[in-house]
Amino acid sequence: MALLQISEPGLTAAPHQRRLAAGIDLGTTNSLVATVRSGKAQTLADEQLRDLLPSVVHYQQNNIDVGWNARDLAALDPVNTISSVKRMMGRSLADIVQRYPNLPYQFQPSENGLPMIQTASGLVNPVQVSADILKALAQRARAALEGELDGVVITVPAYFDDAQRQGTKDAARLAGLHVLRLLNEPTAAAIAYGLDSGQEGVIAVYDLGGGTFDISILRLSRGVFEVLATGGDSALGGDDFDHLLADWLREQAGIDSRDDHGVQRQLLDAAIAAKITLSDAEVADVSVAGWQGQITREQFESLIVSLVKRTLMACRRALKDAGVTADEVLEVVMVGGSTRVPLVREQVGQFFGRTPLTSIDPDKVVAIGAAIQADILVGNKPDSDMLLLDVIPLSLGLETMGGLVEKVIPRNTTIPVARAQEFTTFKDGQSAMTIHVLQGERELVQDCRSLARFALRGLPPLPAGGAHIRVTFQVDADGLLSVTAMEKSTGVEASIQVKPSYGLSDDEIANMIKDSMANAQSDIGARKLAEQQVEASRVLESLQGALAEDAALLSEQESTAIAQAMAALQQQMQGTDPHAIEAAIKALDAQTQDFAARRMDASIRRALAGHSVDEV
């Protein structure tokens, strides 16, 4: 007789009938893949039941190893073993060499300034290395799910910029994966905890992984996840703990490993093992390169306490941006393997005044959240229960006359978002316009970050102010920016997708925000001055054109008075007092009132010449 399958209410009895989707946590140190099976999110293990896949790739002449085997080969063949490639994603070669001068790899520049790494398999770039890691994760998912994936959600640090996000998408495509969405890592963790606990209120997500730190302040209310503010440091993580401890071990053992990458790898492995031991024990035994010794938890904590304090400074800035205090935070979610370090949990608990949440494995929580989101996006589950809102970290705008910045999308605006503003031409007969896209909080172009420039050509040759150009800024769910400019009367259009050639660190973002606050008053004054100077230039240029056409309408005395008022305005423009410039503009306007009226009369007479009253 036929067997009847029975499942729990709300769970699927036949998961193979669902569309196959996966969430991927593409980490700096380790990566994971997860999926939703029978209604529950779970990470997928390899044949040895290991959930984590080290984000390490070893390149040989005829073979590529990914994961644990590659990690084991790192000490023997460091030049051909690429690890922590996530730190290189979207960065220029010059930037990488400056940030990480001790990397053992043989770099070669490419035509676009991006890094290429010489290996036994040939030249590879960070996108290709990331693709090899994604291929291994995808293969694990296919084997576990017994089928091809319909789509994946891949997580990225909250402060990954456009180039880094695009590089991640390119790596996924190279791995043969369909990307449903890129998802911020802290937001993925919020999804995992929010769905499990139904918590409402303000939540802090403290994500300290191998190579990046992110802090996100979120508000969860009735299934809505809203990111109030983000912060962090894209060059700070557990890897830095490991390197500090490895340096300490080298000094204690009296080992000079600076030119021996194999010994350096052994020191690093010993440091990692000691760090893991010290999460549960007060003392760890260490044996490396013929040296044996011990390190206490107290000694380890003294090495890393300054780095932990740096993360708390970022937490303080994020709370200020969100407009909330630590007392208003209901729960603190801990994400990332480095949050297992007792000092981290202790310091974070003291800062927020409550014991952090660790009920979901901090190594797995991001992948689990990504899997839940992938399951929704692939169509297995209605998304009416949950709305996900991310934010952009810095304001986006464009340059206007006088070197001013007109903000189109303010900082911390929820994405995806589209905003448009209308602009016009400054000169008579202007047939082209340069659109200069900027990022930052300051009032002047020179103080903001330039993202891109493009030209809108073919404008109708109208008088100044006659053409109307609509500029639309659109940020998609992955944080990628598209800018489109269109002249309304002709439909002439130009657009660009912003992909910076290198990343912007969290420290730089924090400094840009801090500078905008520190210079707020002086920036407002500089903006007022520039605005009056632009208006003065417009008035003078317009008046000079009018005088060239109709100077005969003025008496000699009137011409002299106008010339003197123009000279006075030009003199004030050289100064720094916007009020004086404004007064000079008004004085010139008063001198030209009669002239303007006569020009209007003359224009009407010319228009009526040769026409009868009936025709009018």
UniProtKB/Swiss-Prot annotation:
GO terms for biological process: iron-sulfur cluster assembly. Pfam families: HSP70 (PF00012). Keywords: ATP-binding, Chaperone, Nucleotide-binding. The keyword Nucleotide-binding applies. InterPro entries: ATPase_NBD, Heat_shock_70_CS, HscA_NBD, HSP70_C_sf, HSP70_peptide-bd_sf, Hsp_70_fam, ISC_FeS_clus_asmbl_HscA. GO terms for molecular function: ATP binding; ATP hydrolysis activity; ATP-dependent protein folding chaperone; unfolded protein binding. The keyword Heme does not apply. Disulfide bonds: none annotated. HAMAP family: HscA. Chaperone involved in the maturation of iron-sulfur cluster-containing proteins. Has a low intrinsic ATPase activity which is markedly stimulated by HscB. Involved in the maturation of IscU. Belongs to the heat shock protein 70 family. This is Chaperone protein HscA. It comes from Yersinia enterocolitica serotype O:8 / biotype 1B (strain NCTC 13174 / 8081).
